[in-house]
Amino acid sequence: MSWDSRPAKETGWFNSDEALYLQLRNQIILGIATDKIRDGDPLPSVRQLADHIGINMHTVNKAYTVLRQEGFVKVDRRRGAVISLDSDKYAALDELHKELGVVLAKAHCKNITRSEVHDLIDEIYDDYFCPSRYGEPKSED
């Protein structure tokens, strides 16, 4: 993967109240979902990425640790962090169930209807799998 050479402040990264390590984690997951990062691709070293985007090395390390725990990255002492997608679908579905439970509870508290949630999910799903945007759709096996 080639990282944007501009500083993080110029790319729009890290413009929210969410913890920086979670924002970095989310950007990497989005990169995987959109095929900008692929299984087997190395990630920059902790030091390189921290220097490049202008954040603390511990923040990058924490993001990589979370990605490893979630089955997106393997860390090898010689190769560094490498994208390695864990194919345990049942564990992924269980994790998704937990995360969506909180999201749906928030939506319910804000009077967002089931139909509106479904429309939003369809819209987001199409952002990742729409042929006109990213070429051929990913396999949905």
At which residue positions do the language-model features occur?
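Charged catalytic carboxylate motif
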Residues: Q23-L24, T59, E99
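A surface-exposed regulatory interaction patch that couples sensing to output
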Residues: S84-D94
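Minor-groove-contacting beta-hairpin "wing" of winged helix-turn-helix DNA-binding domains
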Residues: S45, R79-L85
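C-terminal alpha-helical interaction appendages
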Residues: S87-D88, E99, K138-D141
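Extreme N-terminal segment that seeds HTH/winged-HTH DNA-binding domains in transcriptional regulators
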Residues: M1-P42, Q48, D94-E95, L104-D141
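N-terminal helix-turn-helix
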Residues: P42-K74
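Contiguous, function-dense segments enriched for cysteine-driven chemistry
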Residues: A8, R25, D51-H52, R68, ...
